[in-house]
């Protein structure tokens, strides 16, 4: 049979692999036809929407073109969500074993809210005066709630009794492609790292990954902790849906809205918030950020209520400022291993400090002392990869300082003045050994540094170093630092893995103060860590507590003397 097959092929002049090639050509032709059909479908959909828009315009010519576009977009979104619901139900079924009835109904309710939240966010991004007014505190804009309530029906229902509203808008241009930014917003870890220190714990559940090959139509159920670096401001716990929509070519909208709010007054309700992203010819992305929340103001210390109400604490300007700072930091020297390692270690140090101040993250702390007007003392068990174990104690305290936050920040970075306020490291942090900026602006003091001195580590005869991150923007300033040894510095300089390096960060967070009577100044939060080797929490003594109280008091006194050398008051 083999010879017959061979003779037949040679007689006809057809090669042995003709069936394979023929199949490949058929498949290629089918793929081409499928691609052309998709293009025709898209063009047909665009023509259908244009036809619908023209009919609507003829019915009511008094409406503006923008209003007609909004109406058509809203209808399109409703159709899209309806299609998503059908697709989702076909995939999982309301009564399939892969998903319970309750979960399916809940998912359907999430989908139902999406077009309304998207429509509201898009309108809030497009409209200007008189709905938005320039903020009196820093940059950005604040919402006129009277006009808002008149123009927009409550997407999430009536505001909880006793809650107050806060809404702000800010804009910026980030050096990142729009598609990359959308992908980062879909990934919990990247989202948290992108907004350095603002986000504590974050968990996600994917409801839909979006259309094939993109995040268009993606839907996430998220829970996150959003924090201001002070023990006087409770962490904002948010349960929300994140919906991603490709509005047009180069234009994406990402909207968040609260779900499962319940009756817990500690939760913050997130009204339609998020960002409108527009691709730019140079590869950057123009971001319009909108943050709209409702919360119980009585849970916030009175010294911080003005800050939060103005939007500086949790508002859009802070999100945009954090994003700009992080993106500008990522861009230079991205492939330099030393810089990458140093930045990673500094990020972990900052995260540890923020988690201690705000009691977020995964560490469990035990309250040791919390007397009004005195530092809050906490403790937890500690065991690192080098075999060091014991108890870590922390002290956190917030105080008002009569100085602009930016001015105070810059004074603290003057090396000759460090001994005035730094009670532990002023003899170590005397000169820069290695430093890289967090901004390309030469007038900006934001940087990560390793500070050096001639002070030797006890018993080792090696000089101690200080790892420090300093950052500031219109919403506040932060200085975080920790003592590190010579082997750690060598590891960083070689671009090694620093994830196992033990850190006990010290830090100061400085935010603007907005008093009820127009007073200015700054609210400063001081945080310390101290390790008690080979100890347990039950063995903590009064002297251990007093030592931390003394460190905080001396730091606060130093800050007051920094801005007023004649000041001799304590905490």
Q: What feature does the model see in each segment?
A:
Residues 86, 94-571:
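Eukaryotic helix-grip
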């Amino acid at each position: 049979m083999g010879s017959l097959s061979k003779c037949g092929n040679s007689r006809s002049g057809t090669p042995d692999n003709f069936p394979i090639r023929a199949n490949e050509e058929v498949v290629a032709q089918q793929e081409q036809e499928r691609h052309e059909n998709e293009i025709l479908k898209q063009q047909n959909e665009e023509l259908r929407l244009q036809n619908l828009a023209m009919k609507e315009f003829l019915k009511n010519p008094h409406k503006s073109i923008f209003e007609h576009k909004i109406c058509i977009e809203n209808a399109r979104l409703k159709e899209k969500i309806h299609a998503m619901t059908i697709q989702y139900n076909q995939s999982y079924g309301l009564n399939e074993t892969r998903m319970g009835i309750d979960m399916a109904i809940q998912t359907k309710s999430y989908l139902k809210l999406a077009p309304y939240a998207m429509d509201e966010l898009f309108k809030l991004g497009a409209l200007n005066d008189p709905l938005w007014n320039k903020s009196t505190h820093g940059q950005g804009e604040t919402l006129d709630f009277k006009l808002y309530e008149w123009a927009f029906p409550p997407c999430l229902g009536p505001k909880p009794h006793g809650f107050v509203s806060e809404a702000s808008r800010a804009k910026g241009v980030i050096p990142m492609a729009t598609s990359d930014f959308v992908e980062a917003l879909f990934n919990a870890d990247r989202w948290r790292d992108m907004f350095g220190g603002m986000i504590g714990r974050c968990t996600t559940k994917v409801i839909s990954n979006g259309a094939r090959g993109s995040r268009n139509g993606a839907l996430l159920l998220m829970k996150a902790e959003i924090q201001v670096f002070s023990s006087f401001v409770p962490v904002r716990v948010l349960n929300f849906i994140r919906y991603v929509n490709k509005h047009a070519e180069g234009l994406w909208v990402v909207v968040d809205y609260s779900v499962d709010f319940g009756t817990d007054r500690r939760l913050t309700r997130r009204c339609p918030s998020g960002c409108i992203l527009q691709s730019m010819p140079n590869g950057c992305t123009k971001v319009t950020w909108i943050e709209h929340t409702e919360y119980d103001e009585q849970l916030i210390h009175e010294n911080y209520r003005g800050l939060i109400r103005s939007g500086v604490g949790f508002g859009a300007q802070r999100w945009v400022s954090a994003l700009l700072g992080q993106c500008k930091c990522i861009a230079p020297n991205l492939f330099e291993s030393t810089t990458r390692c140093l930045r990673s270690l500094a990020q972990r140090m900052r995260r540890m400090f923020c988690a201690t101040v705000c009691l977020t993250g995964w560490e469990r702390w035990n309250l040791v002392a919390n007397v009004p007007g005195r530092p809050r003392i906490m403790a937890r068990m500690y065991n690192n990869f080098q075999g060091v174990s014991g108890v870590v104690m922390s002290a956190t305290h917030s105080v008002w300082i009569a100085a602009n936050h930016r001015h105070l920040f810059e004074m603290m970075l003057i090396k000759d003045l460090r001994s005035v306020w730094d009670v532990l490291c002023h003899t170590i942090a005397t000169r820069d050994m290695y430093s890289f900026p967090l901004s390309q602006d030469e007038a900006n003091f934001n940087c990560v540094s390793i500070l050096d001195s001639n002070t030797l580590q006890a018993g080792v005869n090696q000089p101690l170093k200080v790892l420090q991150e300093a950052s500031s923007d219109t919403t506040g300033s932060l200085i975080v630092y920790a003592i590190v040894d010579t082997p750690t510095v060598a590891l960083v300089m070689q671009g090694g893995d620093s994830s196992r390096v033990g850190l006990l960060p010290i830090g100061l967070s400085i935010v603007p103060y907005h008093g009820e009577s127009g007073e200015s100044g700054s609210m400063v939060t001081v945080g310390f860590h101290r390790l008690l080797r080979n100890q347990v929490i039950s063995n903590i003594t009064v002297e251990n507590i007093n030592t931390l109280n003394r460190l905080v008091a001396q730091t606060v006194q130093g800050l007051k003397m920094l801005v007023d050398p004649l000041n001799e008051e304590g905490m």
